[in-house]
Amino acid sequence: LGVLLTICLLLFPLTAVPLDGDQPADQPAGRMQDDISSEQHPFFDPVKRCCVVCNAGCSGNCCP
C-alpha cells in the first residue's frame, strides 16, 4: 500500500492540484488591506504617535 501511494504521489504531485483561489493564503494583498493600521487603532495617541496601550493590533515608538 505504501509503494502504491508513493508511486501515485510521484506521478501526480499535490502541487499539480490547482488552488481554488478564495483562501486568504492565496490573496496576500487582500490580507494586508484587512489589517488595521496603528493610526486607526482606538488606543493610538496621535500626539505621541504611538499606542497608549501596547497590544497585538497596535505598534509604534512606545511599544517594544
Curated annotation (Swiss-Prot):
Residues 17-49 form a propeptide. Disulfide bonds join 50-63, 51-58, 54-62. It is found in: Secreted. GO terms for cellular component: extracellular region. The keyword Secreted applies. Keywords: Cleavage on pair of basic residues, Disulfide bond, Secreted, Signal, Toxin. One of its GO terms (molecular function) is ion channel inhibitor activity. Residues 1-16 form the signal peptide. The keyword Secreted applies. The cysteine framework is III (CC-C-C-CC). Belongs to the conotoxin M superfamily. This is Conotoxin Pu3.5. The lineage of its organism: Eukaryota, Metazoa, Spiralia, Lophotrochozoa, Mollusca.
